[in-house]
Curated annotation (Swiss-Prot):
Gene that encodes the chain: rpmB
MF terms in GO: structural constituent of ribosome
Name the UniProt record assigns to this protein: Large ribosomal subunit protein bL28
Gene3D superfamilies found in the cross-reference section: Ribosomal protein L28/L24
Source organism per UniProt: Buchnera aphidicola subsp. Cinara cedri (strain Cc)
Pfam families xref list: Ribosomal_L28 (PF00830)
A single BP term in Gene Ontology: translation
GO CC term (a single one): ribosome
Keyword Methyltransferase found: no
Sequence similarity: Belongs to the bacterial ribosomal protein bL28 family.
This protein's UniProt keywords: Ribonucleoprotein, Ribosomal protein
Source organism superkingdom: Bacteria
């Protein structure tokens, strides 16, 4: 399963490590993805989603009901 946030749709990025001599080696920047369970009061059930820390902050700000309707459905 790819590391993609279900709310923000962010993916991991590719970049380069640079040494002191400016030699470039490829690097993958991974996301802070976690599984999190939320309770939906309208549907009276729990949902489990893969979400980044920024997505959790969005849910705390706007509420799970609004985010669920806008991004997940």
């Amino acid at each position: 399963m790819p590391k993609i946030c279900q709310i923000t749709k962010k993916k991991s990025m590719l970049g380069q490590n640079r040494s002191h001599a400016m030699n470039a080696t490829k690097k993958k920047f991974s996301l802070n993805i976690q599984y999190h369970t939320f309770w939906l009061p309208e549907k009276k059930k729990k949902i489990r989603i893969r979400i980044t820390k920024k997505g959790i902050r969005m849910i705390n700000k706007f509420g799970i009901s609004k985010i669920y309707k806008k991004y997940i459905i």
